From Swiss-Prot:
This is Adenylosuccinate synthetase. It comes from the Bacteria. It catalyses: IMP + L-aspartate + GTP = N(6)-(1,2-dicarboxyethyl)-AMP + GDP + phosphate + 2 H(+). It is an enzyme of class 6 (ligase). IMP binds at D13, E14, G15, K16, N38, A39, G40, H41, T130, R144, Q224, T239, R301.
Length: 425
């Protein structure tokens, strides 16, 4: 099991960062393969809280290699700022333990401008983006006009590519009576950061293939969650990249078999707009929000909260070929008398055992629940299966039966050490 892919199976915020950090103790390399600094991974080490956006979670472990793959939309200024903030805390990030793909498309100020502009134009139909410029950056990548990290080394090439990029963006800005951008402004923006960021530039695909031949253990760290996937998520309320496990190949350049682990919360949360069948707009939702401290790591927005959706997670398991589940934030459910799990949907007299693709149907689905008795016992910080209440064990067994794959690990607090291994991988 030299290669592991770790992905979220809900709408993100499942606790992937902690799990990657935990498993990376026995790995050599951790790779980010999609998304951008719209992702937020929170890790607690010795009571110190680290909030990572672009950097792989292994950056907190000495001796590990962290890699940002070509599938990541790269905000160079944000990355350098994140590196410098970690150095202040004593974390060593250097050109030997962090490598960035030379093919990464760069997020520029024009991308952030465009995202905000179109979100404002959408009015009441906003997607609810983080306004980090990720979507417009991916649009330019697909449109073959993106500035990539490798372009910064060649002034002539950079100038040509900037002309192409700004012809497109300024045409849109003129049409919307928005001030055009001068090339000199973008050049200055790039030149401010180019020397620092180019120091990390590497042919990541080649390095990963060489590391694999050496027998190194590699973890691929997903961002967001399965139902934010541009193809398989609750479209159009999705992110702009593929978040399922298969993207690990495309977004890194390493084609190899891997063991796939899915991370889920013991309940469900979602940031921003979009369908959410098990959302609880009541005391249950308020309790989950308060106890779970459900504020977005990046956006600081309140996360919507609801019961665990086994239909959704089972579908995500199948989309990513998941072999194993890690269950997080079980301790948030400690005080509940009764806990519900969604086992199916009802819409217009028809039963569904999957999430239909139609947005109009998704928003009208009526969840069907199975109830489980709560355990009414403090489980926060538990580290052995023998200390767990019987009703919590029954809840886990119920989830396994509904999802169709085993739960191997559970997390009982944000701290690195508070993990219980239920079964061997």
């Amino acid at each position: 099991m030299n290669n592991i892919v770790i992905v979220g199976l809900q709408w993100g915020d499942e606790g992937k960062g902690k799990i990657v950090d935990y498993l990376s103790e026995n790995a050599d390399v951790v790779v980010r393969f999609q998304g951008g600094n719209n992702a937020g991974h929170t890790i607690v080490v010795d009571d110190e809280v680290y909030k990572l956006n672009l950097l792989p979670s292994a950056v907190l472990r000495p001796g590990k290699i962290s890699i940002i793959g070509n599938g990541v939309a790269l905000d160079s200024h944000a990355l350098i700022s994140e590196i410098e903030s970690l150095k202040v805390k004593g974390v060593d990030v250097n050109y030997n333990n962090l490598m960035v793909s030379e093919s990464c498309p760069l997020i520029l100020s024009v991308h952030k401008d465009k995202e905000k502009l179109f979100e404002d134009l959408n009015g009441n139909h906003k997607i609810g983006t983080t306004n980090k410029g990720i979507g417009p950056c991916y649009e330019d990548k697909v449109g073959r006009r993106a500035i990539r990290l490798c372009d910064l080394e060649n002034a002539d090439e950079l100038n040509k590519r900037l002309d192409t990029l700004l012809n497109y963006h300024n045409a849109i800005r003129k049409g919307l009576n928005y001030q055009v951008v001068k090339k000199e402004e973008i050049l200055k923006e790039i030149q401010e950061i180019s020397e620092k960021i180019l120091s990390y530039k590497k042919p990541v695909w080649k390095i990963l293939n060489d590391l694999m031949k050496e027998g190194k253990k590699i973890i691929f760290e997903g961002a967001q969650g399965a139902f934010l996937d541009i193809d398989h998520g609750t479209y159009p309320f999705v992110t702009s990249s593929n978040t399922v496990a298969s993207q690990a190949i495309t977004g890194s350049g390493l084609s190899s078999n891997a063991y796939i682990i899915g991370v889920v919360k013991a309940y469900t949360t979602r940031v921003g707009n979009g369908p959410f069948p098990t959302e609880q707009k009541n005391e249950v939702g308020d309790s989950l929000f308060t106890i779970g401290k459900e504020l977005g790591t990046v956006s600081n927005r309140r996360r919507r909260c609801g019961w665990f959706d086994a239909v959704l997670v089972r579908q995500a398991v199948q989309l990513s070929g998941v072999s194993s589940i890690v269950l997080t934030k079980l301790d948030v459910l400690n005080s509940f008398d009764t806990i519900k799990i969604c086992t199916g949907y009802k819409y217009s007299g028809k039963m569904y055992d999957y999430l239909p693709a139609s947005h109009s149907i998704q928003g009208e689905l009526e969840p069907i629940y199975e109830e489980f008795p709560g355990w009414k016992e403090n489980t926060q910080g538990k580290r052995s299966i023998e200390t767990l209440p019987i009703n919590l064990i029954k809840y886990i067994e119920g989830l396994e039966k509904l999802i169709g794959v085993p739960i191997h690990l559970i997390s009982t607090s944000p701290k690195r050490e508070d993990v219980i291994k239920l079964k061997d991988f």
